[in-house]
Amino acid sequence: MSQLDLNALNELPKVDRVMALAETNAQLEKLSAEERVAWALENLPGEYVLSSSFGIQAAVSLHLVNQIRPDIPVILTDTGYLFPETYQFIDELTDKLKLNLKVYRAGESPAWQEARYGKLWEQGVEGIEKYNEINKVEPMNRALKELKAQTWFAGLRREQSGSRAHLPVLAIQRGVFKVLPIIDWDNRTVYQYLQKHGLKYHPLWDQGYLSVGDTHTTRKWEPGMAEEETRFFGLKRECGLHEG
């Protein structure tokens, strides 16, 4: 696979960037998740970061990447509305895996946001998008800038939703390389990895949650529901971090 120039690629239109990365992605599809991480660390520029929402299967990518690159900064965008079990899970995994956790938050506290805007998540798609911009997108952009990131690892998988079904292993987002090492893993592979390494699902998994975000926009799975319907009242799947 040829060397990639981030600055040159950023100057291209999005369609041309996709085409420029096509050959590399074809080769990356043939590699294991561990090999993809190793390739990225060898061939893509630093600084390197890993983002995590500490969701249902978060332990997989946290363990996988941190094993190969110990002390990699792990970015969490904390909305202040996560489940108590999520905060406990964050503490547990940070201690168990010795994570270099970097927490980023909005400039306005949750209470101040509610005073200013009301409950944005109850204001339809437009309100949800504004909420996500304030609490997810802006803090992530700030994290990438402050940590001088040029290569960003994330734990997205194609099986999780229609919006992720065609994502490549390697892309450029927010001006940096984005690497998705476990993009082609199915639920069985995730389960086997967790079992092999003595890792746990998020505590709410046992209560019927397939996906976990904020308390006010996360629903327990019910028979007949698609996984996408458990988040943002079925209006959206993505929180904004992995769009654009």
Curated annotation (Swiss-Prot):
E.C. code: 1.8.4.8
Pfam family, one: PAPS_reduct
InterPro entries to which the protein is assigned, alphabetical: PAPS/APS_Rdtase, PAPS_reduct_dom, PAPS_reductase_CysH, Rossmann-like_a/b/a_fold
Classification via SUPFAM superfamilies: Adenine nucleotide alpha hydrolases-like
Keyword Oxidoreductase: yes
Name of the top EC class for this enzyme: oxidoreductase
Domain of life: Bacteria
Catalytic activity annotation: [thioredoxin]-disulfide + sulfite + adenosine 3',5'-bisphosphate + 2 H(+) = [thioredoxin]-dithiol + 3'-phosphoadenylyl sulfate
Tagged with keyword Nucleotidyltransferase: no
Main location as per UniProt: cytoplasm
Localisation: Cytoplasm
Catalytic site positions: C239 (nucleophile)
Pathway where it operates: Sulfur metabolism; hydrogen sulfide biosynthesis; sulfite from sulfate: step 3/3
Function recorded in the entry: Catalyzes the formation of sulfite from phosphoadenosine 5'-phosphosulfate (PAPS) using thioredoxin as an electron donor.
Family: Belongs to the PAPS reductase family. CysH subfamily.
Listed name of the protein: Phosphoadenosine 5'-phosphosulfate reductase
Source species of the chain: Salmonella typhimurium (strain LT2 / SGSC1412 / ATCC 700720)
